[in-house]
Amino acid sequence: MARPIMIMGCSSDAGKSFVVTALCRHFANRGVHVAPFKAQNMSNNAAVTPDGAEIGRAQYLQALAARIAPQARMNPVLLKPSADTESQVIVMGQVDHAISAMPWLERQPRLWLIVREALYSLMRDYEQVVIEGGGSPAEINLRTSDIVNMRVARECQADVYLVADIDRGGAFAHLLGTWHCLEVEERALVKGFILNKFRGDRALLGNAMEWLYERTGIPTVALLPMVRHTLPEEDTLHHRAHPETQQINLALVVYPYASNLDEFDPLVHEPGVTVVPICGCERLDAYHAILLPGSKNTVASLRYLRQSGLAAEINRAVQRGVPILGICGGLQLLGREIHDPHRLESGDCPGLGLLDLTTTLVPDKTTRQRQVPWQGTRLGGYEIHHGQTQAGEGVQAYLPDGLGWCQDNVYGVYVHGLFENAPYRQQFLERLGWRGQTTGEWSAVVDASLEQVAQLIVESGWII
């Protein structure tokens, strides 16, 4: 196989995931059997592979870009923050309670063996592996515990490319400074610089790329423009307003440890629909519906809702008849009680009491893809949760098989990804008064964006 390609960034959110995704589709379009890899990801936005493994959403998308099935070995270690100093550790797609309980530095030797094995298995099975780094390789304080950046590059002798976000400013200083922080043998692996999110005329750069080359001997191989696309962000929500046609305002309550926010992207991109992240107490009078996303720590999220005053606002909205939809952790928040006998989070806690449900958190995690019967069709989605929920007499089934309940204008479901299904999205919005036609199945929208970003690689002139 060809030497692995590794994309590292000068900072978080420089564009590493974006470039890896574009490269995966670029290689796939050329007929190359390509696979993505990220040794360790930290995110509460997770996805479920066909065989029930849990990986980061970014690597899931990159696998789709490569036109292959997502696999656990593409993201062998996933850290899901559940408190300021705590993370659940997902190893090869499954929760590892023993490693989760270990101090950070004690974990790394064990995790490195797993990372190394996953990487080499991909290198054996694919013609090309495109690797994503984490954060920045210039974090000197993290060098001894590194299992995601230069240690990976040295292990497989990858061709490394450093990417910087030029839209933020300071890109050339970031590239030069990052390169200077690398060891001599690590600099030898760096084959090029990438400037991401460039706006305007290339002439505005003047001789900056030549200046950088004179000091490093490293060429700038690609200048990627700022583009609007529908690809999900790794840890945030797309926020796009449609002021001319605005009909529906949706409030998305973003509490601490909120997860899988990208599943609301299909709503964001519908004409006339605005999804507004609510990150502090504010009046919810102006919204047609309120959305409660998943949570990695439902008890902490409940505490936040009560302390911020949002719990009272949500209750007032329910009394006015505003529809409330909670997904996964959001469902659990809406119930009467959350029992935590194993102290997976923070102990027992009363819920908002808007659904007659009682949830018990258990060590075994449910992770699986689902096809849910719904009004003569099937809705694709996935489950990721520790909770087992018992329904009382006050609720009715909203989805079959214990996957969702409703009580008056309050709805709760365990299935993520429902809004990716055009029929469900259409009906949800129409019930709020929306008069439009959906953009269609979300998978087709995303695939069109994958083609769009892959074309940027071609147009950049990057020979790779």
Cite the ranges covered by each PLM segment.
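Flexible phosphate-sensing "switch/lid" loops adjacent to ATP/NTP-binding sites
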Residues: M1-V318, P323, D340, P363, ...
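Catalytic nucleophile serine of serine hydrolases
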Residues: C328-G329
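A Zn2+-metalloprotease active-site environment signal
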Residues: Q332
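Extracellular/periplasmic helix-exit of transmembrane alpha-helices
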Residues: G335, H339-H342
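Conserved P-loop NTPase catalytic core
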Residues: L344, C349-R368
